Every structure is written in structure tokens, then in C-alpha cells.
């Protein structure tokens, strides 16, 4: 026989369940009629978002509870979000912000924003002539929310890395350690990037930015379809991962089907400003507060296109380049290179010295280069009947765009017991008549061989189409 106290407890429990079910039903019906305004917590939400925006005043028209866009969950929305300058002026405006509140603070009656996703608004990134970086969550002309100072004189590499990591600490402050906000994102924002020193300018109508804290790691992810000079577009992405103590970081940049001129200003491209071909590129940079730069490597895959040089235009069949950059020695090390699609390959590591001097050269100034290859294997079926293997190769010269030529002041290589030395130039000039007139490539080379060179090695290095009778004679000998 059931005790009376047990029956009473069961009746109370059933009553609570019924009340809860009725409450859920009423809430579902009310939400189906439209959002429920919760303006009583507006001040709390404004304060939380203001703290995430470096203390800038944030205004909200109203806060409401509604079904998510997918209709399978509830979400809190801040409608009509504005970021002000502290004097009543509006710097940026977002249509709405979707907000996630922390569960544990709610249990003790405290409102704490855990994540916020803004829709719309504007962002501006400006690189100043002195190298300082200003990031503003607002249109062009807005005061910077984040400032990464310019590089001081006589700054060591380790000091520069430490300064960049300090700048990341400022950038990640909204979701940094010790705060309740774990995620901050902006969707479909108007993005403007300005390079005041190089003269470049890029815009995007629907840029996305996300700051997130996951355990002991912080992550910034951004993607946008940038529009640069001449209306060229470049889908680009950026990802920065660091730890909550900002001791190290990895920066990854990528671009898909982008023209170089859409990503970089002419000043940044230097002698390569005339390159016009679709490109997929990835660059990874690793930084450590104690060791400096620990990783700097990238890959670029080019499609068919053209290159302009002093009024002439030349066709490119595409190719692939992979390499890494040694900052301490200012040396670019290329470990994979292919041209003319995949038909032409160069095996071995190519060391390019004084890379910064090459990139600093203006488009109309000679760009000097110094290239060394400890051992290399040329596989160029269109020019040589067999792969050519050389060692101790060094090529010194300059790209002279004004002369439409590449000068070689020193070419040195070794094949077996023979040492080859040469100088000359590779040039382009108008040739032909009528419909056949066009830009043709020419080669002028003066060289000599010291030591002994096997006739078979000569045949391997003999260019196809040059003195075929002599080459056949050597082959029969």
C-alpha cells in the first residue's frame, strides 16, 4: 500500500512536469509569433561588448530572444549595434549580433557574454609609411582599435618577433586569457586595406573575421575576396594561431586563383610587377619569442598567363615553385621548381642571395641576383635531349627591364672534370616582318671550358636546334 506522503510527492512532481510542459508550450507559441524582447539585460550586454571593443561605447537598440535561422535552437540577438567614438559619433554599425551567454554565470544570476557574432559593419587595416599597422573596427578614417608600432632602428630579429607577438596580444585581447568572451566574429563586413607606403588599396564587400579561444590556444581566421587595382579580385585567407602566453605563433596566408597584382602593390612586387598569371599561393611563418623566426616557407602554383617587360609581353605556360626563406642570411632556398606546366623541372636546391635587394628594386631599375646551386639537374625536354647534371653552379647578374634583358656577369659550373665559365645576356627584341613580326627571345653567351669534358656530356648539354650537324657528328664519334 502506497503511503500518503509518497502520493503527495508524486502529485507535486507530476504538477511540476505539467507546469514545465505548459511553460514550454507557451514559450514555443510565443516565439512562433516573433522574437521576445529582453531589454532588461541590454545594459549588461552593452558593457560586455564595449569591453571587447577596447572600451569604446557600444549601443544596442534592443535585445531579443528568438529562434535561430535554422529553427532548431534559441539564440539571443542584439539588434542595431553601433560602436561610438566616445563623443556621440557612430564609427561602425552592424545590423545585428548573435550572442551566446555563459551557462555557469547564469546559474549564479550573472550575465556574461561567451560568444558574439556581428553581421555587417566595417573594418579598416592601414599600413603606415613608417611600417606601423593600424586596425580599426570601422570605416576608413576611424581611430584604430589595435596598433602595432613601427619597427625601431637597430632592432634585432628576436626583438622584432617579440614586438609582433606583443601586437598579437593586443589583437587577441577581446578573447584573451582571463576574460569571459571566448569567441568574437564579424560576418559580411566591408573591409578596406590601405598601404600608405606602397600606394596599394584593396576592398572587400563580404569579409569574415573570427577570434576564438580554444583551451590554451588562440586563433584568428579571416577570409575575403579582395578587389585591388584594375578591378582584379583575389580570394585570400589568413590564419594566426598562438598560445595564451604569446610565446610563439604560426601565421598562414593563402590565395586561390589570384593575380599577383591583385594581392600586392607595384612597389611590393618590384621587378615582378609585370607578371600577370593566375596563382594559388600559400605562405607559412613560424615565430618564437626566444628563437625568432623558426619557419618561413611557401609555395606558388602559376597558371597560363603573361609577363610584361619594357613594353613587351611574353607568354607563360605556368609552373610551380616551393621554397623557404632564411631571414638571418637573407637567402631564398628553392627546393622544387617546374616550368612550362610540368614538362620542365630543376632538381636540387637553388640558393638566391640578397633577396631583399631584389624585391626592393623598382620595376624600371636593375634587379641584381646571385644564385648558387651545389648540385642541380635540368630536365628541359624542349631544349636538351637528355637531363643535364651540373655541380657547383653559380649565376650572378641582373634583370634589366629597361633593356628587356637579363644580364649574366658570371656563370660558373662543373661537369665531371670540366669547369665551365661564361657571361652573356638573355634578351627580347622585335623580329620578323608583317604578320610574323613579334617579340623573340635571343641568347648571347661567351664562355670557355677548363679541364677535360667527356664528349657524351657535351652532347647532353648541346641545345636542340643549335648546330644539329655538329651534334650528330659528336654522337657518332
Language-model features and meaning:
Residues 61-63, 79-84, 96, 121, ...:
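Generic short beta-strand segments
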Residues 90, 199-219, 223-231, 237-246, ...:
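Beta-propeller and related beta-repeat scaffolds in trafficking/envelope systems
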Residues 60-73:
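Short edge beta-strands and adjacent turn/loop segments
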Residues 1-53:
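N-terminal type II signal-anchor transmembrane helix
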Residues 46, 51-53, 57, 73-75, ...:
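Secondary-structure transition motifs
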Residues 39, 228-234, 311-313, 341-347, ...:
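Solvent-exposed loop/turn segments connecting transmembrane beta-strands
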Residues 80, 189, 219-224, 331-339, ...:
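Transmembrane beta-strand segments that form the barrel wall of outer-membrane beta-barrel proteins
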Residues 55-62, 276-278:
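A short, amphipathic edge element
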Amino acid at each position: 500500500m502506497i503511503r500518503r506522503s509518497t502520493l503527495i510527492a508524486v502529485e507535486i512532481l507530476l504538477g511540476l512536469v505539467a507546469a514545465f510542459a505548459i511553460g514550454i508550450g507557451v514559450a514555443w507559441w510565443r516565439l512562433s509569433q516573433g522574437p521576445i524582447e529582453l531589454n532588461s539585460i541590454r545594459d549588461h550586454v552593452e558593457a560586455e561588448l564595449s569591453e571587447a571593443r577596447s572600451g569604446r561605447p557600444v549601443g544596442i537598440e534592443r535585445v531579443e530572444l528568438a529562434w535561430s535561422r535554422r529553427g532548431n535552437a534559441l539564440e539571443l540577438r542584439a539588434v542595431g549595434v553601433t560602436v561610438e567614438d566616445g563623443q556621440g559619433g557612430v564609427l561602425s554599425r552592424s545590423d545585428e549580433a548573435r550572442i551566446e551567454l555563459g551557462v555557469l554565470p547564469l546559474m549564479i544570476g550573472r550575465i556574461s557574454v561567451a560568444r558574439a557574432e556581428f553581421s555587417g559593419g566595417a573594418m579598416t587595416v592601414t599600413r603606415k609609411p613608417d611600417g606601423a599597422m593600424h586596425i580599426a573596427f570601422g570605416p576608413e578614417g576611424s581611430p584604430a582599435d589595435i596598433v602595432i608600432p613601427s619597427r625601431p632602428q637597430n632592432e634585432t630579429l628576436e626583438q622584432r618577433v617579440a614586438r609582433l607577438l606583443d601586437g598579437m596580444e593586443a589583437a587577441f585581447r577581446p578573447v584573451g586569457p582571463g576574460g569571459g568572451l571566448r569567441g568574437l566574429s564579424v560576418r559580411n563586413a566591408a573591409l578596406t586595406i590601405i598601404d600608405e607606403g606602397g600606394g596599394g588599396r584593396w576592398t572587400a564587400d563580404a569579409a569574415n573575421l573570427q577570434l576564438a579561444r580554444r583551451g590554451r590556444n588562440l586563433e584568428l581566421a579571416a577570409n575575403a575576396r579582395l578587389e585591388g587595382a584594375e578591378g582584379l579580385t583575389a580570394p585570400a585567407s589568413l590564419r594566426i594561431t598562438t598560445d595564451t602566453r604569446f610565446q610563439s605563433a604560426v601565421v598562414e596566408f593563402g590565395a586561390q586563383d589570384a593575380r599577383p597584382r591583385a594581392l600586392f602593390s607595384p612597389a611590393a612586387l618590384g621587378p615582378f610587377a609585370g607578371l600577370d598569371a593566375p596563382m594559388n599561393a600559400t605562405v607559412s611563418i613560424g615565430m618564437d619569442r626566444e628563437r625568432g623566426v623558426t619557419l618561413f616557407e611557401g609555395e606558388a602554383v602559376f597558371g597560363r598567363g603573361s609577363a610584361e617587360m619594357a613594353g613587351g609581353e611574353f607568354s607563360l605556360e605556368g609552373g610551380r615553385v616551393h621554397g623557404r626563406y632564411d631571414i638571418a642570411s637573407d637567402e631564398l632556398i628553392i627546393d622544387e621548381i617546374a616550368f612550362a606546366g610540368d614538362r620542365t623541372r630543376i632538381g636540387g636546391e637553388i640558393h638566391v642571395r640578397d633577396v631583399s635587394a631584389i624585391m626592393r628594386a623598382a620595376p624600371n631599375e636593375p634587379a641584381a641576383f646571385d644564385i648558387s646551386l651545389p648540385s642541380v639537374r635540368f630536365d628541359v625536354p624542349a631544349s636538351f635531349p637528355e637531363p643535364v647534371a651540373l655541380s657547383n653552379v653559380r649565376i650572378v647578374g641582373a634583370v634589366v627591364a629597361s633593356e628587356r634583358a637579363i644580364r649574366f656577369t658570371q656563370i660558373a659550373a662543373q661537369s665531371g672534370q670540366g669547369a665551365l665559365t661564361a657571361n652573356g645576356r638573355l634578351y627580347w627584341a622585335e623580329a620578323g616582318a608583317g604578320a610574323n613580326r613579334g617579340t623573340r627571345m635571343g641568347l648571347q653567351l661567351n664562355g670557355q671550358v677548363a679541364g677535360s669534358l667527356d664528349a657524351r656530356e657535351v652532347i647532353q648539354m648541346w641545345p636542340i636546334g643549335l648546330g644539329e650537324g655538329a651534334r650528330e657528328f659528336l654522337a657518332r664519334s
